[in-house]
UniProtKB/Swiss-Prot annotation:
NCBIfam families in the record: rpoC_TIGR (TIGR02386)
Assigned GO CC terms: DNA-directed RNA polymerase complex
Organism lineage: Bacteria, Pseudomonadati, Pseudomonadota, Gammaproteobacteria, Pseudomonadales
An example Gene Ontology molecular-function term: DNA-directed RNA polymerase activity
Species for this entry: Pseudomonas putida (strain W619)
Record-listed Mg(2+) binding positions: D460, D462, D464
Name this polypeptide is given: DNA-directed RNA polymerase subunit beta'
UniProt entry keywords in alphabetical sequence: DNA-directed RNA polymerase, Magnesium, Metal-binding, Nucleotidyltransferase, Transcription, Transferase, Zinc
One Pfam match: RNA_pol_Rpb1_2
Annotated TM spans: none
Length: 1399
């Protein structure tokens, strides 16, 4: 008995470890793992089903088939444990040792490991400095390789074909050694002297000039150093012993009917053993060379197929023509070991069923079918029944439960009390896809779900299913209740706004209840208190919408917690007074004294959470929901065809638009406008018409005429059902109503271009056949997009999670004072995001001063909450430096101060929060939702008319930023720079709006001018790009020869002639090399120079430029001398959005990216080469000029002699993030990427906090490239982890040595995931073979710092409660350490202590 107890004790012992190392196995090591050699290919005897001796399932090698029973049956039972049977040689043990014991095969001839041979870059090839083709020729017995040239003229590693080999034999006899096959490769690898080679390479690299050579050498050097450092020997890449997998991991299962189901590995092993045995026999018989050679080649191929089938040549197929699954296939891909079994396990104690609505539930409850609960909580019920004495044994309890006796239900109710369950809906796109609820037992078979959590789950009740899981242990129940309970997840982790927000019916009910109607029953009455209003309403004496006065008692709780009570009389409506009854004390009456639209309700819940706290908010949300359902029922809102009121003006608007289109058509027919211009104008026309119709329609729908108490006719907001649904935000939008009652508008073709003829009908009138046909494009594109984008979005989320999974908050403060400069985000003149919203929940990095003084009003280190935001807005501060994840200096992980507020909880983030995964989920989750929502507007093209002026929205003072301008003769300014901006500041000096000014814009105001709201302050032509002179003088044409470089056109409408520059490809041969230009000269014909430089004022004209001045004309400063026409635009749609986000995160270089100035200086153009222009920048600091070749077709924004700053745009196009990082630094890159990604999401109305994007960006910026190695061990051009380099540099600086210099590198998320420190994480992501090969060769250690690695090895993740567990475990182990010291050490320490005290 004692033995048994000890045995059970030993079972539970888990090995503690801190890292996992992967390396190459030496032959000795493989033999040490092995329990015997497999000599025969047999598996099991088909009659007895017993394993064959020495075969692949041999019981002597691998252990017994049945527990504690040898094969022949001589020894049975536990008492013989450990005995080895004399007869069959089997050790008596547990059968599960067959899952652990390995065997080996002694190979008759060495075999190269295919991973190290074929996985690029080939490691064997790199070490031997031979090409892969050459090595393969040696391995597969096509050529000889010289191993030892001796005294001959041959070279080591030289390949010889048969003829050359025999010639060499005749010439030199056996002075040299040349062989073929894996033995030759093994010999060569064995002969490599790593230390000598490393020394040689280190000397050779600095002396080499060619880039490619250096790259190749440093690759070899890296590999050699990896081998040296890891203790792997190169010859171990060639196998002499092959390990055999334990038999229970490659089972052979007899099916009924005498057939067997087997793992493919058995076939592959059989092949290897057969060929190996045959080779042994041939060698014993000393068979002819050619036969042996063939057999060796076949053995090599068999081992290749076992390790990685299909990597070389054709895959070996089984009986059913299907390629066999090799060892490599077992671990890679979605069905492989990593993703199928280690990262995605199935769990016990779970069930799933369809969901239905539970409108009567409280927020923390869910309805669980009794049948389901009985099955899920079985063990608990058994225990309870036994404890109560209702059943004597578990077996009896089981019977009771099966019979469903009445006592069982009572016990079930007791077991379930306060035992939370987890509900999950697939796809789980963010952490709110799994939440905990308290179960309520219900009849029926469907799970009931609380309506308010549907938004978090993205669930609806059209047949969705959900899974239920039971947290078993006390700790799990505690975490479920404290962290995952639906009542604790009121705010969304993506943006910190409530996610428990009423939608649809509830919103409609609350909106209906808080609307006011003129002349409703009971209007003008005055009530003493809310109770009286309630009584009168119930008695039917006052209508819900009647305007009344009522006396209320309100308690208002201020931000600092002080409570003020006051009584006042308010003008309100009956419905609002009723609604105020459910509002918690502490909120003012004004929160309900307005029509409750969706935004208002969301704001109300948010305010409630911030002011009165979590518990009250939960109760309030429930009350809101019950009220909303009740009143939407009372309202009786429904849609009928008559609700779609078509505006009377529609016919007129469409008629006038049609006439204008006809006019344009006739202009086109007579050749006055080009095809492109016609297209643009027509589409602009129809867009405007569509907007007019929808304006008229909304005006018509939103108002209705009623008679007031005095009998006068007045207008009030309409009670049209459809309008109410859209206006309240319950369902539908203006765009959809437009299609129902306005006009459908323009449609897009599948390629994204817009069809010129719009659909003028709406759904109420019905579409004609042609119109229907046109609209099928959009509808189908929508559906196809959805299917594709769901997959794409899921993949984006996977990559994001993988790159950020190891980012966890590990300390409170890293102590940096770097940060990002935050300003309000202004776009197209609107403040899209005020400063307050951007800094909310961030920590201030540097003191904020009161504008114009030295007073610190917000000290550094402040976590900005709502109160501080109000304060910052009040003091009209317009820029703040805040801490950001990008600048955090924590080594592993991130610090709480740089991250700021935990958005889902509203306080500073806790240590252990997995902020990386939260960031990835927050960015990935809306991706899927956006893509699932492309087609709601049915492909109706929404195209913006091009902007051609700046009209200010608010009055204020003009500020010009970063603008170079010249003053025209009429006193207006003309912009001559590209990145200029015009801003309007209010009286506090805070910028309210900001506009980009294109080159050539005419500005009618000056810096510091006061302007009124609505004033137009700048104008330009959106369809052309002008060239503006910066000085006055006379025009002379250079190289402008008619019909050679230019052609003259006469405008038929105005009779003026224009000069158009011909495209190079349209010019005759004589004109190909000429560069047409306009030169400025003074009155005497002398060249004029650009102001402040010695560059002649000469403007080169690109192709298709239109020149509007004549030769010899006098012109003034700021006049336009030529225009370059611009192209048309495509529609903006999230379809362009999701790939855009993916491109930004993958840091892809865009096609035809914008060209940025590499240095600051003066622009000049050098000699042209074929098809390219030579751009020369002479730096301002006097260093060497920088030259760059730019293709001719690129349109340049700069002219000769212009000053540019480093990083300024020279040629327009999409920006390349790598260039921004290189030229402008990390902050500029962060600003660019955050804004670009936010633009895509903002277009769809999705809010994501900036810090999530910055968190991902931090992971993309982990690596640096060494530019100078200094005294460090790094090699120039190496990519290293930033933290590693910083630590090394600190060490060097402390020793007064030269530190290494580096540049930051931006990696795309896929690359960043694959280059993480952890090989387990990288291998389970993508390219498993390559990652593992590399890790094994370098002998990598995985310190299990991320979440993924720990999940794979089956431990708690080092985040949240797991982080505490791991740090406690490490602390305990460190505390135990000093006890393990030897006696001599104790003695030495004692004597030392005594001596020191004696002195």
């Amino acid at each position: 008995m004692k033995d048994l107890l000890n045995l059970l004790k030993n079972q539970g012992q888990v090995e503690e470890f801190d890292a996992i190392r992967i390396g190459l196995a030496s032959p000795e090591m493989i033999r040490s793992w092995s329990f015997g050699e497999v000599k025969k290919p047999e598996t099991i005897n088909y009659r007895t089903f017993k394993p064959e001796r020495d075969g692949l399932f041999c019981a002597k090698i691998f252990g017994p088939v049945k527990d504690y029973e040898c094969l022949c049956g001589k020894y049975k039972r536990l008492k013989h444990r450990g005995v080895i049977c004399e007869k069959c040689g089997v050790e008596v043990a547990l059968a599960k040792v067959r899952r652990e014991r390995m065997a080996h095969i002694e190979l008759a001839s060495p075999v190269a490991h295919i991973w190290f041979l074929k996985s690029l870059p080939s490691r064997i090839g790199l070490l031997m400095d031979m090409t892969l083709r050459d090595i393969e020729r040696v391995l597969y017995f096509e050529s000889y390789v010289v191993i030892d040239p001796g005294m001959t003229t041959l070279e080591k590693g030289q390949l010889l074909n048969d003829e050359q080999y025999f010639e060499a034999l005749e010439e030199f006899g056996d002075d040299f050694d040349a062989r073929m096959g894996a033995e030759a490769v093994r010999e060569l690898l064995h002969a490599i002297d790593l230390e000598h080679e490393i020394g040689r390479l280190r000397e050779e690299i600095p002396q080499t000039n060619s880039e490619t050579k250096i790259k190749k050498l440093s690759k070899r050097l890296k590999l050699m150093e990896a081998f040296q450092g890891s203790g792997n020997l190169p010859e171990w890449m060639v196998l002499t012993v092959l390990p055999v997998l334990p038999p229970d991991l490659r089972p052979l299962v007899p099916l009924d009917g005498g057939r067997f189901a087997t793992s493919d590995l058995n076939d592959l092993y059989r092949r290897v053993i057969n060929r190996n045995n045959r080779l042994k026999r041939l060698l014993d018989l000393s068979a002819p060379d050619i036969i042996v050679r063939n057999e060796k080649r076949m053995l090599q191929e068999a081992v290749d197929a076992l390790l990685d089938n299909g990597r070389r040549g054709r895959a070996i197929t089984g009986s059913n023509k299907r390629p066999l699954k090799s060892l490599a296939d077992m671990i890679k891909g979605k069905q492989g070991r990593f993703r199928q079994n280690l990262l995605g396990k199935r769990v016990d104690y779970s069930g799933r069923s369809v969901i239905t609505v539970g409108p009567t539930l409280r927020l923390h409850q869910c309805g669980l079918p009794k049948k389901m609960a009985l099955e899920l909580f079985k063990p608990f019920i058994f225990g309870k029944l036994e404890m109560r004495g209702l059943a004597t044994t578990i077996k009896a309890a089981k019977k009771m439960v099966e019979r469903e006796l009445p006592e069982v239900w009572d016990v079930l109710a007791e077991v379930i009390r306060e035992h939370p369950v987890l509900l999950n809906r697939a796809p789980t796109l963010h952490r709110l896809g799994i939440q905990a609820f308290e179960p309520v037992l219900i009849e029926g078979k469907a799970i009931q779900l609380h309506p308010l959590v549907c938004a978090a789950y993205n669930a609806d009740f059209d047949g969705d299913q959900m899974a239920v899981h039971v947290p078993l242990t006390l700790e799990a129940q505690l975490e479920a209740r404290a962290l995952m309970m639906s009542t604790n997840n009121i705010l969304s982790p993506a943006n910190g706004e409530p996610i428990i927000v009423p939608s649809q019916d509830v919103v409609l009910g609350l909106y209906y209840m808080t609307r006011e109607a003129i002349n409703a029953k009971g209007e003008g009455r005055v009530f003493a208190d809310l109770q009286e209003v309630d009584r009168v309403f119930r008695a039917g004496e006052a209508a819900l919408h009647a305007k009344i006065k009522v006396r209320i008692n309100e308690t208002v709780k201020d931000r600092d917690g002080s409570i003020t009570k006051n009584t006042r009389i308010v003008d309100t409506t009956v419905g609002r007074a009723l609604l105020f009854q459910v509002v918690p004390a502490g909120l003012p009456y004004d929160v309900v004294n307005q029509p409750m639209k969706k935004k208002a309700i969301s704001k109300l819940i948010n305010q409630c959470y911030r002011v009165v706290g979590l518990k009250e908010t939960v109760i309030f949300a429930d009350q809101l929901m019950y009220t909303g359902f009740a009143y939407s029922t009372i309202s009786g809102v429904s849609i009928g065809v008559n609700d779609f009121v078509i505006p009377d003006e529609k016919a007129r608007i469409i008629g006038s638009a049609t006439d204008e289109v006809k006019e344009i058509e006739s202009q086109y027919a007579s050749g006055l406008v080009t095809q492109g211009e016609k297209y643009n104008k027509v589409i602009d026309l129809w867009s405007k018409a569509n907007d007019e119709v929808s304006k008229a329609m909304m005006a018509n729908l939103s108002k209705e005429k009623v008679i007031d108490r005095e009998g006068k006719e007045v207008e009030q907001e309409s009670f049209n059902s459809m309008y109410m649904m859209a206006d309240s935000g319950a369902r539908g939008s203006a765009a959809q109503i437009r299609q129902l009652a306005g006009m459908r508008g323009l449609m897009a073709k599948p390629d994204g271009s817009i069809i010129e003829t719009p659909i003028t009908a709406n759904f109420r009138e019905g579409l004609s056949v042609l119109q229907y046909f046109i609209s099928t494009h959009g509808a189908r594109k929508g559906l196809a997009d959805t299917a594709l984008k769901t997959a794409n979005s899921g993949y984006l989320t996977r990559r994001l999670v993988d790159v950020a999974q190891d980012l966890v908050v590990t300390e409170i403060d890293c102590g940096t004072d770097h940060g990002l400069l935050m300003t309000p985000h202004i776009e197209g003149g609107d403040v899209v995001e005020p400063l307050g919203e951007r800094v909310l929940g961030r920590v201030i990095a540097r003191d904020v001063f009161k504008p114009g003084t030295e007073d610190v009003i917000v000290p550094a280190g402040t976590l900005v909450d709502e109160q501080w935001v109000e304060f910052i807005e009040l003091n009209s501060i317009d820029e703040v430096v805040v801490r950001s994840p990008i600048n955090c200096e924590t080594r592993y992980g991130i610090c709480a101060k740089c991250y700021g507020r935990d958005l889902a909880r509203g306080h500073q983030v806790n240590i252990g929060e997995a902020v990386g995964v939260i960031a990835a989920q927050s960015i990935g989750e809306p991706g899927t939702q956006l893509t699932m929502r492309t087609f709601h507007i049915g492909g109706a093209a929404s195209r913006t008319s091009a902007a051609d002026s700046v009209q200010v929205k608010n009055g204020g003072m003009v500020r010009l930023h970063n603008l170079k301008q010249v003053e025209r003769a009429d006193g207006n300014l003309v912009a001559v720079s590209r990145s200029g901006e015009l801003a309007i500041a209010d009286e506090f000096g805070r910028e309210r709006e900001r506009y980009k000014l294109p080159y050539g814009a005419v500005i009618s105001v000056k810096e510091g001018d006061k302007v009124e709201a609505g004033a137009i302050v700048a104008k330009w032509d959106p369809h052309t790009h002008p060239i503006v002179t910066e000085l006055k003088g006379t025009v002379t044409f250079v190289g402008m020869e008619e019909n050679i470089t230019i052609k003259r056109q006469t405008d038929e409408l105005t009779g003026l002639t224009n000069i158009e520059v011909l495209d190079v490809k349209d010019r005759p041969a004589a004109g190909k090399e000429i560069r047409p230009a306009i030169k400025m000269v003074d009155a005497n014909g002398k060249d004029l120079y650009l102001p402040g430089t010695d560059v002649p004022a000469q403007y080169f004209l690109p192709a298709n430029a239109l020149v509007g001045v004549a030769d010899g004309a006098q012109i003034g400063v700021g006049d336009v001398i030529a225009r370059i026409p611009q192209e048309t635009s495509k529609t903006r749609d999230i379809t362009g959005g999701l790939p855009r986000v993916a491109d930004l995160f993958e840091a892809r270089r865009p096609k035809e990216a914008s060209i940025l100035a590499e240095v600051s200086g003066t622009i000049a153009f050098g000699k042209e080469t074929k098809g390219k222009r030579r751009l020369v920048i002479t730096p301002t600091d006097g260093s060497d000029p920088y030259e760059e070749l730019i293709p001719k077709w690129r349109h340049l924004n700069v002219f000769e002699g212009e000053q540019v700053n480093r990083g300024e745009v020279i040629s327009d196009g999409p920006s390349d993030p790598h260039d921004i990082l290189r030229l402008l630094g990390v902050s500029a890159l962060a600003k660019y990427i955050v804004n670009e990604i936010q633009d895509v999401y903002r277009l769809q109305g999705v809010k994501i906090n900036d810090k999530h994007i910055e968190t991902i960006l931090r992971q993309m910026l982990r690596k640096v490239e060494i530019s100078e190695s200094g005294d460090s061990s790094f090699i120039k051009g190496d990519q290293m982890e930033l933290t590693q380099v910083l630590v090394e540099n600190e060490r060097l600086a402390a020793d007064d040595k030269f530190v290494s210099k580096f540049t930051r590198v931006l990696l795309g998320i896929t690359k960043a995931s694959l280059s993480t420190e952890s090989f387990i994480s990288a291998a389970s992501f993508q390219e498993t073979t390559r990652v593992l090969t590399e890790a094994a060769v370098t002998g990598k250690r995985d310190y299990l710092r991320g979440l993924k690695e720990n999940v794979v090895v089956g431990r708690l993740i080092p985040a949240g409660t797991g982080l505490a567990y791991h740090s406690e475990r490490k602390r305990r182990r460190d505390a135990d350490k000093p006890l393990r010291v030897s006696a001599s050490e104790v003695e030495a320490a004692l004597t030392e202590a005594l001596n020191s005290s004696g002195n």
